[in-house]
């Protein structure tokens, strides 16, 4: 199931983005930079005391054509719609402002848990000014300094106390997948077409507190799936609904709630920057990925060469998704749609594949013999052994004499050798370098 969602709201210049980056910072630093992945700080992962959660910085959703107070209200509404817990950020230097009171009133009526963070409390004298914020009616104000990291522990304790316990009954063996992509690539048509292909709809289930509709269905061969709503399709009347950044955020929510992600491209329009944003997030989240090129029926004079050229373009633009299979479909004519359930199941199985340590180390030793380890400043990298420590995605720890001696290119070489020996089509794999004690 998806992680709890924490939204950060507040008027401009109270330090929302600094707080967002401070909470996400340590988690983000763990993930090695992957060439070609464009990061977007609108949405990120956080962790506190072993509790994982996703964060939204609503201030990153731009509505510059709207009056300032209208923008603030809309951002608060987004937080209410999307979040399980809301952090409202205020600035101790300005005291309680009219804009703060407006946001507080909206949040108070929402019945969502709200944690009040009073930012820029950079010295002990400022702590006395914190008590004025009780008048917002949101409970205890937590003094923090997002720049210096002071007070974040107590605030995050309050945040995770409001996480609902996961209901064990919600877990099932169905494969959860979603169609994700920028607006107008044909996600809705694909959803309708694949349900039309399989027809046996078990139920439409209201999923999380955000009321996403997750559709359970059984494919013709008996395989069971849950299609995660990419959300936003069914919601109307919101000024922010059509913004690309909001579409990106909703796609990220669907990715977090899926085992397998189908990245949808529009064959007529080629590859856009937002496609890269969304696909990059799916890769970083460790989800299994299938690239679906929709509207293939609209390409004139299409043949095998046309398909090869488009495939080469995808491989060039999405180099970090070299493991993802590509399928060319048409929601309109239903061309190749029947392949999707089997491809989804295969990617899911590969994502959960486990390799015995003895077999893995045989492959590792062969790789070392074929391409000796690099050296730096007279010191050679020594690789001792490897073991698989997790699935979804498959994660391997490689024990070495000095992790700094393993260059990115050599780690990529070892990953390629592992992929050549074991079929991990459709799933990223993670290699963690660890010093042997």
Swiss-Prot record:
InterPro entries named among the record's database cross-references: G_ENGA (IPR031166), GTP-bd (IPR006073), GTPase_Der (IPR016484), KH_dom-like (IPR032859), KH_dom-like_a/b (IPR015946), P-loop_NTPase (IPR027417), Small_GTP-bd (IPR005225)
HAMAP family: GTPase_Der
Protein name as catalogued: GTPase Der
Gene that this sequence comes from: der
Organism phylogeny: Bacteria, Bacillati, Bacillota, Bacilli, Lactobacillales
Role summary: GTPase that plays an essential role in the late steps of ribosome biogenesis.
Record family assignment: Belongs to the TRAFAC class TrmE-Era-EngA-EngB-Septin-like GTPase superfamily. EngA (Der) GTPase family.
Quaternary assembly: Associates with the 50S ribosomal subunit.
Keywords: GTP-binding, Nucleotide-binding, Repeat, Ribosome biogenesis
NCBIfam families: GTPase_EngA, small_GTP
GO BP term, example: ribosome biogenesis
One Pfam short name: MMR_HSR1
Residues the entry annotates as binding GTP 2: 181-188, 229-233, 294-297
Domain KH-like: 353-437
Transmembrane segments: none
Positions of the EngA-type G domain: 4-167, 175-352
GO molecular function terms listed in the Swiss-Prot or TrEMBL record: GTP binding; ribosome binding
Positions contributing to GTP 1 binding: 10-17, 57-61, 119-122
SUPFAM superfamilies according to UniProt: P-loop containing nucleoside triphosphate hydrolases (SSF52540)
Keyword Chaperone in annotation: no
């Amino acid at each position: 199931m998806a992680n709890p969602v924490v939204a950060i709201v507040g008027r401009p210049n109270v330090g929302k983005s600094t707080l967002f980056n401070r909470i996400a910072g340590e988690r983000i630093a763990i993930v090695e930079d992957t060439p070609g992945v464009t990061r977007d700080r609108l949405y990120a992962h956080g962790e506190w005391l072993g509790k994982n959660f996703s964060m939204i910085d609503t201030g990153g959703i731009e509505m510059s054509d709207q009056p300032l107070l209208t923008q603030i209200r809309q951002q608060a509404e987004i937080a209410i719609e999307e979040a399980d817990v809301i952090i409202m950020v205020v600035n101790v230097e300005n005291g309680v402002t009219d804009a703060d009171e407006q946001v507080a009133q909206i949040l108070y009526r929402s019945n969502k848990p709200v944690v009040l963070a009073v930012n820029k409390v950079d010295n002990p004298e400022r702590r006395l000014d914190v008590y004025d914020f009780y008048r917002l009616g949101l409970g205890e104000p937590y003094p923090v300094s997002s720049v210096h990291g002071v007070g974040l522990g107590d605030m995050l304790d309050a945040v995770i106390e409001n996480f609902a316990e996961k209901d064990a009954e919600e877990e099932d063996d169905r494969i959860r997948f979603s169609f994700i992509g920028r607006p107008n690539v044909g996600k809705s048509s694909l959803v309708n077409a694949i349900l039309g292909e399989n027809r046996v709809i078990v139920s439409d289930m209201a999923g999380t507190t955000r009321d996403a509709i997750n559709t359970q269905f059984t494919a013709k061969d008996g395989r069971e799936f849950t299609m995660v709503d990419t959300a936003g399709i069914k919601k109307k009347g919101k000024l922010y609904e059509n913004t690309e950044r909001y579409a990106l955020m909703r796609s990220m929510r669907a990715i977090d709630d899926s085992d397998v992600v189908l990245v949808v491209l529009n064959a007529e329009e080629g590859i856009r920057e937002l496609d890269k944003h969304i696909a990059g997030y799916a890769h970083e989240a460790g989800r299994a990925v299938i690239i679906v090129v929709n509207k293939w029926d609209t390409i004139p004079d299409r043949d095998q060469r046309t398909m090869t050229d488009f495939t080469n373009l995808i491989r060039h633009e999405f180099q970090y998704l070299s493991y993802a299979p590509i399928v060319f479909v048409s929601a309109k004519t239903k061309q190749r749609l029947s392949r999707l359930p089997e491809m989804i199941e295969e990617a899911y199985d590969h994502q959960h594949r486990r390799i015995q340590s003895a077999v893995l180390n045989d492959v590792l030793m062969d790789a070392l013999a074929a391409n000796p380890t690099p050296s730096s400043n007279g010191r050679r990298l020594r690789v001792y052994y490897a073991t698989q420590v997790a699935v979804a995605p498959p994660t391997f720890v490689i024990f070495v004499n000095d992790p700094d001696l393993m260059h990115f290119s050599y780690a990529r070489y070892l990953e390629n050798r592992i992929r050549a020996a074991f079929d991990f089509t459709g799933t990223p794999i993670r290699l963690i370098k660890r010093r042997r004690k």
